[in-house]
From Swiss-Prot:
GO annotation (BP), single: regulation of neuroinflammatory response
Pfam families linked to this entry: IATP (PF04568)
Localization: Mitochondrion
Gene Ontology molecular functions: ATPase binding; ATPase inhibitor activity; protein homodimerization activity
Assembly, per entry: Homodimer; represents the active form and is present at a pH value below 6.5. Homotetramer; represents the inactive form and is present at a pH value above 7.0.
Keyword Mitochondrion: yes
Source taxonomy: Eukaryota, Metazoa, Chordata, Craniata, Vertebrata
UniProt keyword annotation of Nucleotide-binding present: no
Antiparallel alpha-helical coiled coil region as annotated region, ranges: 73-105
Annotated protein name in UniProt: ATPase inhibitor A, mitochondrial
Biased composition (Gly residues): 25-38
Length: 105
């Protein structure tokens, strides 16, 4: 039990320490936005602008991917509905054959 409490304390302090090192994106090297290129590493308004552009780009890519995924699922649904209709016709055809066999008896 003591080990569990010690671990919890370690993780919470580790999270606090790492969150203190994060800064605003694009504010320079060593902060949350550093290392993304020379403009972002320099910090300042150009770094923040570059970080904002990058975030906007990735949000747009995510929206495009979600739209493509939604379209794919809609196509899959349409395909399966058509397959259900085809199989239902097959079932009806076989039921008709069974009725015909019963009628012939």
């Amino acid at each position: 039990m003591a080990r569990l409490l010690l671990r919890r304390g370690f993780f919470s302090s580790h999270i606090r320490m790492s969150s203190d090192q994060l800064g605003e994106l694009g504010t320079g090297a060593g902060k949350g936005g550093g290392g993304g290129g020379s403009v972002r590493a320099a910090g300042g308004s150009f770094g923040r602008r570059e970080a904002a552009e990058e975030e906007r780009y990735f949000r747009q890519k995510e929206r495009e991917q979600l739209a493509a995924l939604k379209n794919h699922h809609e196509e899959e649904i349409d395909h399966h509905k058509k397959e259900i209709e085809r199989l239902q016709r097959e079932i009806d055809r076989h039921k008709g054959k069974i009725r015909k066999l019963k009628h012939d008896d």
